[in-house]
Amino acid sequence: MTSQLHKKGEAWSARFSEPMSELVKRYTSSVFFDKRLALVDIEGSLAHASMLAAQKIISADDLAAIQRGMAQIQGEIERGEFEWQLDLEDVHLNIEARLTALIGDAGKRLHTGRSRNDQVATDIRLWLRGEIDRIGDLLKGLRSALLDLAEQNADTIMPGFTHLQVAQPVTFGHHLLAYVEMFSRDAERMLDTRKRVNRLPLGAAALAGTSYPIDRHAVAKTLGFDGICANSLDAVSDRDFAIEFTAASALVMTHVSRFSEELVLWMSPRVGFIDIADRFCTGSSIMPQKKNPDVPELARGKTGRVNGHLMALLTLMKGQPLAYNKDNQEDKEPLFDTVDTVADTLRIFAEMVAGITVKSENMRGAALQGFSTATDLADYLVKRGLPFRDAHEAVAHAVKVCDDRGCDLSDLTLDEMKAELPNVAALLGDDVFGYLTLEGSVASRNHAGGTAPDQVRAAIAAARAALG
């Protein structure tokens, strides 16, 4: 006998007196984006079917048929031969319909003891777990590229900035290590998020669990989950893990964006600290001289995109009562695009960093401007017994004198320095000029976390060891 299901096409249509309108079908269908979950949907279904057979809920013959049918469907999907149908709403019903067409009633038994509510929650977690692992590898690749560039420039001196004003000299290697730290924290956050992703919702069914004697722990073990979601209502409605991942991704992109801003600035001819390889830049359709740093500029822009996805997911969840609601269909596109954006950005940045040309003489020249060793002169006086605030005031006066003359502190003779600083003249000796050199300044910051080249090399070695 032909059922209402087959007359109307939807898996739930027997309850209704008229078919869904075509407009509503297009509005509510998710198959053309959630088909991305197809392979993990099959993986989850096979684990569920194996458990059903082990619990004697379906027969061994049914299990064998399901496994055979799913293998064929997976092959069709991987070869691009699977025919996705809008009328079947989503990835789950498309696969189930194809399975039933291939193996008959055994395919109809697959959904025993589960709902699409716990099925999709499982699919997303399975998929996201793999993507977190991939992003972790990409973060590792970017950190490795940064460490290579830092190692090449452990002695390269550049100005360090606060408020975009020259502050103190640092090494370019030290500057790059700051980004290694940022991306290391990002990797830690991803791993921590993975712990909460890696819980199995399957078995929660629609919201209340199921009356069948299922074994959720067996399914969790088969699928590599650390455990099960403890509450069936929470299991089907929770999207904290997606929000948490997107928040971690927003921080990744924020760090990329900060680095991008510096790359754009450094590549500007008015700064000229670096050059980015041609393959990562574009020209102008009107100005023949232009070489534009499009990759870092676009990464800056894409950061706003990921931030927007985070806000979209937070807003999606803020008004939902327990348990599952159709609103949650809107979780996937922001999540999918976040993964794509972060993964593509990290991959291209690792390649771009490896192709950066450093203009060390320009960096050094910039560090010689702006009185970057003024703090070193103050420290020199403090080490000879002067209170720091008094030393600060004396050096500030010397800077004002040099600024008016258009010279640097190191351009003053010892006699000129003593004449301008009579209150500290007795503390000044010929050795003061060693403190005013760029090399002397960076070498003096020889402690853990400092910019001295020896410390930079030690930090690089430690970071490489942490990468494994």
Swiss-Prot record:
Subcellular location: Cytoplasm
SUPFAM superfamilies assigned: L-aspartase-like
Keyword flag Lyase: yes
Gene3D superfamilies referenced in this protein's UniProt entry, alphabetically: Fumarase/aspartase (C-terminal domain), Fumarase/aspartase (Central domain), Fumarase/aspartase (N-terminal domain)
Keywords for this protein: Amino-acid biosynthesis, Arginine biosynthesis, Cytoplasm, Lyase
Domain of life: Bacteria
CC per GO annotation: cytosol
Major location category of this protein: cytoplasm
GO biological process: arginine biosynthetic process via ornithine; L-arginine biosynthetic process
Record CDD domains: Argininosuccinate_lyase
Top-tier EC class: lyase
GO molecular function, one term: argininosuccinate lyase activity
Record field: catalytic activity: 2-(N(omega)-L-arginino)succinate = fumarate + L-arginine
Disulfide bond entries: none
Annotated EC: 4.3.2.1
Pathway it works in: Amino-acid biosynthesis; L-arginine biosynthesis; L-arginine from L-ornithine and carbamoyl phosphate: step 3/3
Family: Belongs to the lyase 1 family. Argininosuccinate lyase subfamily.
Matches recorded under HAMAP family: Arg_succ_lyase
Protein name in the entry: Argininosuccinate lyase
UniProt organism field: Paraburkholderia phymatum (strain DSM 17167 / CIP 108236 / LMG 21445 / STM815)
